Structure formats: C-alpha cells, structure tokens
Amino acid sequence: MKMSFALTFRSAKGRWIANPSQPCSKASIGLFVPASPPLDPEKVKELQRFITLSKRLLVMTGAGISTESGIPDYRSEKVGLYARTDRRPIQHGDFVRSAPIRQRYWARNFVGWPQFSSHQPNPAHWALSTWEKLGKLYWLVTQNVDALHTKAGSRRLTELHGCMDRVLCLDCGEQTPRGVLQERFQVLNPTWSAEAHGLAPDGDVFLSEEQVRSFQVPTCVQCGGHLKPDVVFFGDTVNPDKVDFVHKRVKEADSLLVVGSSLQVYSGYRFILTAWEKKLPIAILNIGPTRSDDLACLKLNSRCGELLPLIDPC
C-alpha cells in the first residue's frame, strides 16, 4: 500500500497549507510504524532484568525510535521509504560534485524543513532521557539526524551521523544553524512555490525537476563556499575521531541496548561487534530482524515508545 502526504509551500505568503485530501495529523504518525505483536509480559520482565543488572549501560538508537514521532525510516517492511517509493537517499559524492544535485537537494530540503523540524520526541526518547538523569544510562549513541534526543534533554549523547539542525561550509567549515539558513532561502526565493509529496528520514521531500529549476541556493557568508547539512550522507564515512570516541564508550560500558535499528549500516554495526568481542550482554529492541540478532542475549519485537516507558531504571 502506498502512503503519502502533501504540503504546499508558498514562499511569498510565508506559510504552509496542508492538502485537505491527505492531512498531516497525529493519525499519520502510525503510517510509519511497522506492525508488531502485542507486548509479551515475559519479554518485558527480561528487559527489566537486563536494565536492572546494567551499571554502565550504553544505548544505540536508530530510525525505528523516531517513527512514532512521525519520521519514516528507510527499511521497515511496507512502511519504510524503500518500500513506499523507488526514491533513494542522496549520495555524498553526487552532492559534492554536482551543482544541479545540490540545487535539487536544497529545494526539497527547504520545503520539508518546517515539518521535519517540528517533530517532537516520543515516549521512547523521554524514557532514555530519564534514564540518563537517574544515572542508569552511561552513554547514548544515535544514528539519527533528527535532534529528537537533544529535544528530549539527552546530554551524554553522540550523534554518529551528525544532525540536520546544523549546516557546514564544505570549504571553510563555518557552521550555521539550519533555521538561520531557512531565512536566507526565503530571502533568495520570495516568489518561489512548490508542492511537496512524501517525507524522507533526513527531512527531504519529493519535487519535480521543473519545480526545482528556479530555486536559488545561498553560499557560505564567510567564504562563498558550498553548504551541506552537518550529516553523513550515504557513501561518506563517519569522522574517525568520533568512531574512536564511541569505541571507547563501548569498552567502558558493561552492557549494550540497541533501540530501533536493523544495524544494516556498518557505521553502527561495528560497535555491536566491539561489544560482542568484549563479551558484553547485548539486548535488541526492534520491530523485525536485525543484523545482530545472533549476537544478542535478548531480542524484543515491540514498539520502542510502548515498551521503554514500562522499564524502571532504578
């Protein structure tokens, strides 16, 4: 089943107009959460025991924790981006080399940003933030770029793939808040308008080539260089210093909990291998199979926002 939504942006009027035939509402959040079996009380007890025994718990989250906030993931059966469309995420090399590709990316990102940036943490994000405040969570590593952990108050946090809230200059490294860049887009494109369909996990939406052609893209205010979101695009690599930092946190931990990730991407999977080699107990909470199910002592197929708030971190 194909599922989508539509928003119309009118830059001259400075507002979004929801398509009444497919409104974006709280009901749409469930569109991106794959089906899962009812909670198994025995599995809940097993996870509770796992958390109770953990003294230096490291948690790694993926896109599955944010689907309940209305942000789709890529790989979930029937509801992920790959299942709903033949579109694929932008490649790092293409973005760096091609001005038309950068123009298309930023036009789509400009249209999608107001909705993407408005998403809020769900009970799973708040639960992990509470665990940190109570001293249960030693470190949190997220593969997501949506800033929802930060919005929930998490501070002992590594954003493995960066964050869409920030923009970097590819030439001089100048960092700009994404909201500030949105204002520059509006100044450069006062009469530009487009209708967007479908939201991607990185805030991208889908526009036609004709819609994109007239869109003006700002450059770095410091050096005139090209701007890029402070995220790791597909085909790029995570900063080695960040990788080393996370490896150290894993080695300092006494247990690892994976939340909402299939671990198909090696950038996150490698830390599971490190934990396994260190003989740390590994628990996985994810709807559907993961790359590391055979390494885990506990696997739960449940919604993150339904299960995590049931766990007592004390």
UniProtKB/Swiss-Prot annotation:
The active site is at 161 (proton acceptor). It comes from the Eukaryota. Binds 1 zinc ion per subunit. Detected in vascular smooth muscle and striated muscle. Detected in insulin-producing beta-cells in pancreas islets of Langerhans (at protein level). Widely expressed. Weakly expressed in leukocytes and fetal thymus. The keyword Zinc applies. GO terms for cellular component: mitochondrial inner membrane; mitochondrial matrix; mitochondrion. Residues 1-28 form a transit peptide. GO terms for molecular function: histone deacetylase activity, NAD-dependent; lipoamidase activity; NAD+ binding; NAD+ poly-ADP-ribosyltransferase activity; NAD+-protein mono-ADP-ribosyltransferase activity; NAD+-protein-cysteine ADP-ribosyltransferase activity; NAD-dependent protein biotinidase activity; NAD-dependent protein lipoamidase activity. It is found in: Mitochondrion matrix. One of its GO terms (biological process) is peptidyl-lysine deacetylation. It catalyses: N(6)-[(R)-lipoyl]-L-lysyl-[protein] + NAD(+) + H2O = 2''-O-lipoyl-ADP-D-ribose + nicotinamide + L-lysyl-[protein]; N(6)-biotinyl-L-lysyl-[protein] + NAD(+) + H2O = 2''-O-biotinyl-ADP-D-ribose + nicotinamide + L-lysyl-[protein]; N(6)-acetyl-L-lysyl-[protein] + NAD(+) + H2O = 2''-O-acetyl-ADP-D-ribose + nicotinamide + L-lysyl-[protein]; L-cysteinyl-[protein] + NAD(+) = S-(ADP-D-ribosyl)-L-cysteinyl-[protein] + nicotinamide + H(+). Its EC number is 2.3.1.-, 2.4.2.-, 2.3.1.286. Its cofactor is Zn(2+). Keywords: DNA damage, Glycosyltransferase, Metal-binding, Mitochondrion, NAD, Nucleotidyltransferase, Transferase, Transit peptide, Tumor suppressor, Zinc. Zn(2+) binds at residues 169, 172, 220, 223. Gene3D superfamilies: SIR2/SIRT2 'Small Domain, TPP-binding domain. It holds the Pfam family SIR2. Residues 37-314 form the Deacetylase sirtuin-type domain. Induction: Induced by glutamine (at protein level). HAMAP family: Sirtuin_ClassII. PANTHER family: NAD-DEPENDENT PROTEIN DEACYLASE SIRTUIN-5, MITOCHONDRIAL-RELATED. Expression is down-regulated in a number of cancers, while overexpression reduces cell proliferation, transformation, and tumor development. According to some authors, ADP-ribosyltransferase activity of sirtuins may be an inefficient side reaction of the deacetylase activity and may not be physiologically relevant. This is NAD-dependent protein lipoamidase sirtuin-4, mitochondrial. It comes from Homo sapiens.
